[in-house]
């Protein structure tokens, strides 16, 4: 301290010092001055981070001082032999110019605080710009220069905690970026550098983060593509990571001009405060060693498949039908590249297959619920009475307007708007089942396994399960409808006639929706039984009209013009009214098959009635008229699928009565028959509705 005071008291008179002190004392003084300059430099560095511009100016001044001082040190030996006034004057002037430098020691810890304040912010800035490697390298540099022997006080703890928090934050952000960032290799490499880990550890962390993301995915397509892409990245990572690590092996912050500029450092400060080892980010040798990546991936897949299998996921739950289920799978397969198929098959056999089968089973089971609703609706549809007291068979279409048809006939037949929609839903159900069967056939072309196992026991394939469902469901429907048909068949009283007809029409329309669904269920037999009931109703209706008209219109003069006969009023009116009823029923009921059942029964009944009338004929005109009607019926039968046998004159006489042979000669019979042949082409177009479609077209032409 005495020496310090002495030197301080004579600092303004350097010439006197040199004259009164030895060379050794002068060198000692030079060292002291150098120490003072260095301390002053550190003091200036403490303030540099507060003001960038001031720092630049101070650094330039300090650089000049240090350069001058280095020259003094390099030539200090000259002081021993060249103590001349000019030299003393120059040294005195130099030191006098810098006498404002503080003589107190600089605080390295204060410098670190100010340095970290800039550096940590820039670390975050680099990371947010997705410059992951630069961000990690800078943070590693910050951690490396932190002294191990910092004072154990509150400020030091704060500084250490800030750095550790920054490292933890970067670690978490890097893990998140492993799945969200496009530059995944850079992210994983940054994590390895930051944690001084090896490639195996980096790959484990990457797979773990990808696993967390995969576990929250529920869409089969997104899940599969993400999984396969993860495997591809994991296989490609090692070589790419090695390239990044090799490039970062000798990272030197002196060469990162942008980093230095943003954290307010330049080369002279780095040299002043840091060693060469401090500014390097080295990579441990074991990081670059070979490792068994395939084994890591295989172990991860086994663990991942186990977690997925024990989860409550349902990858195909968004599929509402087997068609959409197939479209999801087909679309997924179309997006796969050839190298990915092998790994997809492994994923399919381990995870997706069971989910696909479960979703298929759920869809098929939901169709079972639909069947139960159909059965409930059928019960209601069958039991509900006609909406009014309208009798479909007593209604003459030509006497009513179209809106009455909608208001009366259709509701009476169970075909109001609500039931119409019900029929449409049945047709839609038929289409769904047909599409489902087609889908199961398509699945067999995908070369994928569909092992049912314990998910659907007792069945070999999904197709077997669906076919059994169809058979069982429609067997239940058949049993229910069969009870309806039996109920209708025993309704014979006149009071039940209207209800029987209404229910007949309902059930026939219903069965037409079902009969194509399952060939093993005899819906056609029920339709045939109901059609026979309707045929009996129509035949009774027509013959009843014929009998009533025959009683009312006894005069046949209007039907005879000279030797030409036309059909009787009774026959004509009964057939026209029958045609009205067929038009009311609609073409969905009155099919060619139905006409094939109706016309033989109808024409047979009308033929027998004509024979009875012939036997009871009271005049030749009546006999000729009834003969005309009988022959006309036979000619109509020729245009059906069941033509009647042609009757000659002798057989005709035997059928009616032999005693009239003299009254009704063969010439009369042939004349009537010729009139029938002439009349049929003129009148047949009125009756084509009665004929099967092919026959009707033949008649029209």
From Swiss-Prot:
Entry keywords, A to Z: Cytoplasm, Golgi apparatus, Membrane, Nucleus, Protein transport, Transport
GO biological process: protein transport; retrograde transport, vesicle recycling within Golgi
Domain of life: Eukaryota
One Pfam family from the record: VPS51_Exo84_N
Annotated compartments: Cytoplasm; Nucleus; Golgi apparatus membrane
Membrane topology category: Peripheral membrane protein
GO cellular component: cytosol; Golgi apparatus; Golgi membrane; Golgi transport complex; nucleus
Membrane-crossing segments per the record: none
Role noted for this protein: Acts as essential component of the peripheral membrane COG complex that is involved in intra-Golgi protein trafficking. COG is located at the cis-Golgi, and regulates tethering of retrograde intra-Golgi vesicles and possibly a number of other membrane trafficking events.
Family: Belongs to the COG1 family.
Quaternary assembly: Component of the conserved oligomeric Golgi (COG) complex which consists of eight different proteins cog1-cog8.
Name of the protein this chain belongs to: Conserved oligomeric Golgi complex subunit 1
Gene, per the UniProt record: cog1
